[in-house]
Amino acid sequence: MNKFQEISYNFAFSMMGKVTYSIFLAFCLFTVKMGCAQQESQDFIVPEDSMQNLDDIVSQKSTAIIEYAKNFLGVPYVWGGMSPSGFDCSGFINYVFKGFGFNLTRTSYGLAELGKTVRLSELQPGDLMFFKGRNMSVNRVGHVALVVDTTDGVIQFIHAARTGIRIDTFNNSSYYVPRYIKSKRMDYIGY
């Protein structure tokens, strides 16, 4: 087992209990809300601490995904690459998320169709950002990156650049700002 397989294995099993709990909690909330309980239908209010627990689970999962992604800093860019010997942008995102049980579509264009659209001002660590590719005249998603930090409104993301896996800053970037298309938030509870 190489270093990256061991990390993936350890992350997957350390998160299993949290994922199982989150799925169970989401199912219970959904079942009660939809009136599957034996009593007559009544207004149902989700306790605030339960919603906080869900927020904490999402935050923990996105933090774990980001920390796992950082293990690959410096891995070279390889067009079509989907392994620690070399990644392209969507191959990197797929590999990282697969370590947490996500089975995502392969292309950046396909990934851009998943999740919930969020504004730049609403970005959180764990969100995905989508950009035009190298050819600015093509108005289509051609690149994807994972947001790692948004402290003080400064957006940093990890991605497979031509120079390899690295972290870049979005704000005031003469390369990424004009190529930005949209951002998406993944459903971390649903997986």
State where each predicted segment sits:
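Intrinsically disordered, low-complexity
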Residues: 2-6, 12-22, 29-75, 186-191
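Catalytic cysteine-centered active-site loop
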Residues: 56, 75-125, 136
